[in-house]
Design a protein with these regions (language model features):
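Histidine-centered, transition-metal-coordinating active-site segments
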Residues: 1-24, 29-37, 66, 81-87, ...
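A generic membrane alpha-helix/interface feature
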Residues: 16, 60, 73-74, 180
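Short pre-active-site segment immediately N-terminal to the catalytic Zn-binding motif
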Residues: 35-47, 76
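Active-site alpha-helix of zinc metalloproteases
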Residues: 50-51
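Short active-site segment of divalent metal-dependent hydrolases/proteases
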Residues: 54-62, 165
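A glycine- and small-aliphatic-rich helix-loop capping segment at beta-alpha/alpha-beta transitions
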Residues: 63-76
């Protein structure tokens, strides 16, 4: 199922450039960052790796533009909402029925962090019934995505690592595609200029 990441670009589509980030590279980078953090904190590295490698398995082609298009079409025809994290859970749990643990599925569902979050403290989740209710809420309430918080420290680490992984790579891709003319715009960045420095500084 990992092959579902093949040929899906991270942000920039329709560019013939081997250096542009793809989903497969992104999830590996998230996994590496999260495992490094998890190792320092004494967390479950197997759970971290499972969440990290599976978190974007339901993402659309053409990045978030593809997700936005599918969401608009899906909502217009069904009244429900499409979100890639919810679809990742659907792919693993419903379509392929892979018997994945509650903690792994929850980490995948709750990995989105594209909004301000100064603290990531695990939420309470005891059973699949409550998890399924949380998934269903995401289908019918567009704001439910913004309230998702992982139920484990491992899930929280992956969520933070996801942001660390794409901040620098998205900058690099923007420069390689000439969307940004020069690296000088990042020269004074507090988190670092290059991806490696950004990762090291944020970890």
């Amino acid at each position: 199922y990992y092959n579902r990441y093949a040929d899906k670009t991270q942000v920039f589509s329709f560019y013939k450039n081997d250096d542009i980030s793809h989903r497969a590279l992104h999830v590996q980078l998230v996994s590496r960052i999260a495992r490094n953090i998890g190792r320092m904190l004494g967390l479950d590295l197997d759970l971290i790796e499972a969440v990290a490698l599976g978190h974007d398995i339901g993402h659309t082609p053409f990045g978030h533009a593809g997700e936005k298009f599918l969401n608009e079409s899906y909502h217009a025809n069904t009244g429900r909402y499409f979100n890639h994290n919810v679809h990742s859970v659907r792919v693993l749990d419903k379509i392929f029925n892979l018997n994945i643990s509650l903690q792994t599925l929850d980490g995948i569902l709750c990995h989105n962090g594209e909004f301000e979050c100064k603290e990531c403290r695990p939420s309470k989740l005891d059973n699949f019934k409550d998890f399924d209710a949380k998934v269903e809420e995401c289908y019918i309430d567009q704001s439910a995505i913004d309230r998702l918080v992982p139920s484990t420290l491992e899930g929280c680490v992956v969520r933070i690592s996801d942001m660390i992984a794409y901040i620098g790579k998205d900058r690099q891709d923007a420069i390689k595609t000439k969307l940004i003319d020069s690296e000088s715009v990042f020269a004074e960045s507090e988190i670092g200029k290059y991806n490696a420095a950004i990762i090291n500084n944020l970890i």
